[in-house]
Amino acid sequence: MLVFYAILFVTVFSNTVMGATIDKPIPKPIFREAIEEMEVNKRAKNPYCKEEKCPVGKHCPKKPIVCRIGPCCV
């Protein structure tokens, strides 16, 4: 009888605890938010004009300026 209860406990415990944590996938919006946050962090680390991003014939201004959208070459 004790063996029966032990097996029953193990099956119920594994189905409720392990099944609740392993079987449920992570929702896709969480991944999307994480990717967007990484993109924002990349832009925040490099806010200034970079000479290598400027097209041919254009250069960054002498005074360092923060580029919000695209390269700020003049």
Curated annotation (Swiss-Prot):
<keyword id="KW-0732">Signal</keyword>
<keyword id="KW-0528">Neurotoxin</keyword>
<comment type="function">
    <text>Inhibits voltage-gated potassium channels.</text>
</comment>
<keyword id="KW-0165">Cleavage on pair of basic residues</keyword>
<feature type="propeptide">
    <location>
        <begin position="20"/>
        <end position="41"/>
    </location>
</feature>
<comment type="similarity">
    <text>Belongs to the scoloptoxin-07 family.</text>
</comment>
<keyword id="KW-1015">Disulfide bond</keyword>
<feature type="signal peptide">
    <location>
        <begin position="1"/>
        <end position="19"/>
    </location>
</feature>
<dbReference type="GO" id="GO:0015459">
    <property type="term" value="F:potassium channel regulator activity"/>
</dbReference>
<keyword id="KW-1220">Voltage-gated potassium channel impairing toxin</keyword>
<keyword id="KW-0632">Potassium channel impairing toxin</keyword>
<protein>
    <recommendedName>
        <fullName>Kappa-scoloptoxin(07)-Ssm2f</fullName>
    </recommendedName>
</protein>
<keyword id="KW-0800">Toxin</keyword>
<dbReference type="GO" id="GO:0090729">
    <property type="term" value="F:toxin activity"/>
</dbReference>
<dbReference type="GO" id="GO:0005576">
    <property type="term" value="C:extracellular region"/>
</dbReference>
<keyword id="KW-0964">Secreted</keyword>
<keyword id="KW-0872">Ion channel impairing toxin</keyword>
